[in-house]
């Protein structure tokens, strides 16, 4: 019997993110070389990201900015009102 998890592991998230990025790039008809020239991210970094999901945060943010997706990162580590209320209980 296999054990299944409803949560993803980081490597899964990386690969899914890379796949979605590649799809967006292709939909916009932008080559990897063009993207490297416009973003300041090296061609090697872009290729590695699309193949393995590995990229520095700075490079990922540059690429997101180029495709007007930088705001997608706003929700990461955002503390919502419920968490602030809970934190007050323990302070």
What are the roles of these predicted feature ranges?
Residues 64-78:
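Short, highly charge-biased, low-complexity peptide segments
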Residues 52-65:
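Short, basic-rich loop-to-helix N-cap that marks the start of a DNA-contacting helix
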Residues 19, 29-31, 58:
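Residue-level signal for the short linker/turn that defines the boundary of a DNA-recognition helix
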Residues 29-47:
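Short alpha-helical DNA-recognition segment
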Residues 2-27, 76:
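A short, Lys/Arg-rich alpha-helix, primarily the initiator
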Residues 3, 74-91:
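Short, charged recognition helix plus adjacent turn
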